[in-house]
Amino acid sequence: GVILQYPFYAGIFGILNYSGLGAILIHAFVSITNPRFYTVVVFIFSGLLNMIVPSGGSQFIVEAPYIMPAAADMGVSLTYVLNAFTIGDLSTNLIQPFWAIPVLAAFKIRFKNIFPYCIIAFITSFIIICLYFLLWMY
């Protein structure tokens, strides 16, 4: 799995950076949002990207080249953007099984048995985090 996984992430990084898609994403981020809502957009986008690139470091390599310049263009603090990225990455770990594989194997439990609880925790945390970014970040 790992032998295929990291070259796949490098391929995503290469496509984004060398095809011009990264520049298009920077302009898209700047055009669809404003400084007030940018952290929420980064939070949601990081969560979605986490489903494709579950490794936090690899995800940062793929995502940072366009979320950071877009933040700089809008004048949003990079501290807020990095927090939104990290929390977006971590929050969607609740609904993908990679983190739970060792625990599930140790206790001989299937992911479908804990998934409903993970969904409840994810939805609750998603709402609270979005409200935090919208109400208290500025």
Protein language model features and the residues they cover:
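Hydrophobic alpha-helical transmembrane segments of multi-pass integral membrane proteins
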Residues: 4-16, 30-69, 74
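Transmembrane helix-loop junctions in multi-pass membrane proteins
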Residues: 14-26, 52, 132-138
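Re-entrant/interfacial helical elements at transmembrane boundaries that shape
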Residues: 24-27, 57-70, 98-110
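Internal alpha-helical transmembrane segments of multi-pass membrane proteins, especially GPCRs
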Residues: 4, 8, 83-87, 115-123
